[in-house]
């Protein structure tokens, strides 16, 4: 990783690494290490550690924000916001895809744009921060970058209702078809993206929906389809 890229990333995360090798490892994919016959360390173990820290900090946030929720409700919220889509969006906004070290084969197949790889780099950064600066440093970073997005997603009035599942049940009951969702547009800056999604049955567009994430936009499209096709309003 070039020094300027590392410096910019350290400024973004609000921490100067005492052990720069940790930051380097966090952005090193296994394919890169394999090509060098494992003479460098890759980020899988840091990803594992970062995932655990992320779950804890987001769990803490949800516990504070929704004090009357059940354990099941909190788990559902966490699963909806700690996922590949959200993490990859954050990683892209931070430019981690431009700093990742990939093997030649992985790079040629578009590895720097694969949500799974990009999301794993975010988790690895969290793990590196935890090891280099301790829990509070990692917690501060997550709160800064992740919690505001989680706040918007969980704060949406339609969060609790699973409209996609309901729509699929009704469509399959009547026609055996499965609704499909397509992204029509992405608007706004990376840190405040809004998605426009349509829901189709066969090739017919039933409805559209907007949301701060693809999943939220899909839920809104399903909700609108339920209202238009089945007259369901709640």
Swiss-Prot record:
Disulphide bridges: none
Organism superkingdom: Bacteria
Chain residues that bind Mg(2+): 47, 120, 123
Keywords recorded for this protein, A-Z: Cytoplasm, Endonuclease, Hydrolase, Magnesium, Metal-binding, mRNA processing, Nuclease, RNA-binding, rRNA processing, rRNA-binding, tRNA processing
GO cellular component term, pick one: cytoplasm
BP-aspect Gene Ontology terms: mRNA processing; regulation of gene expression; rRNA processing; tRNA processing
Active-site residues per Swiss-Prot or TrEMBL entry: 51, 123
Keyword check for Isomerase: no
GO function terms (MF aspect): double-stranded RNA binding; metal ion binding; ribonuclease III activity; rRNA binding
Entry-linked Gene3D superfamilies: 3.30.160.20, Ribonuclease III domain
Pfam families (alphabetical): dsrm, Ribonucleas_3_3
Ranges of residues in domain RNase III: 6-134
Keyword rRNA processing in record: yes
Cofactor annotation: Mg(2+)
Reaction(s) the record says it catalyses: Endonucleolytic cleavage to 5'-phosphomonoester
EC code: 3.1.26.3
Domain DRBM residues, every copy: 162-231
Compartments it resides in: Cytoplasm
CDD domains listed in its UniProt record: DSRM_RNAse_III_family, RIBOc
Residues of the signal peptide: none
Role: Digests double-stranded RNA. Involved in the processing of primary rRNA transcript to yield the immediate precursors to the large and small rRNAs (23S and 16S). Processes some mRNAs, and tRNAs when they are encoded in the rRNA operon. Processes pre-crRNA and tracrRNA of type II CRISPR loci if present in the organism.
Family according to the record: Belongs to the ribonuclease III family.
Subunit-structure text: Homodimer.
Protein name: Ribonuclease 3
Organism expressing this protein natively: Bdellovibrio bacteriovorus (strain ATCC 15356 / DSM 50701 / NCIMB 9529 / HD100)
């Amino acid at each position: 990783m070039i020094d300027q890229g590392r410096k910019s990333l350290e400024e973004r995360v609000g921490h100067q690494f005492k052990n720069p090798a940790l930051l380097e490892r966090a952005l090193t994919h296994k394919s890169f290490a394999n090509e060098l016959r494992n003479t460098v360390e890759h980020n899988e173990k840091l990803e594992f550690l970062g995932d655990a820290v992320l779950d804890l900090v987001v769990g803490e946030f949800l516990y504070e924000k929704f004090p009357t929720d059940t354990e099941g409700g909190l788990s559902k919220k966490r699963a909806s916001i700690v996922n590949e889509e959200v993490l990859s969006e954050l990683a892209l906004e931070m430019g981690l895809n431009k700093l990742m070290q990939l093997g030649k084969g992985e790079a040629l197949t578009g590895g720097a744009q694969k949500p799974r790889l990009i999301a794993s780099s975010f988790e690895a950064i969290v793990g590196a921060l935890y090891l280099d600066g301790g829990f509070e440093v990692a917690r501060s970073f997550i709160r800064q970058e992740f919690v505001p997005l989680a706040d918007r997603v969980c704060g949406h009035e339609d969060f609790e209702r699973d409209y996609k599942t309901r729509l699929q049940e009704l469509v399959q009951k009547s026609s055996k078809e499965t609704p499909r969702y397509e992204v029509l547009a992405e608007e706004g800056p990376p840190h405040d993206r809004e998605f426009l999604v349509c829901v189709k049955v066969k090739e017919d567009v039933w409805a559209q929906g907007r949301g701060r994430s693809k999943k939220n936009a899909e839920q809104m499209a399903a909700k609108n389809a339920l209202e238009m096709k089945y007259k369901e309003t709640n």
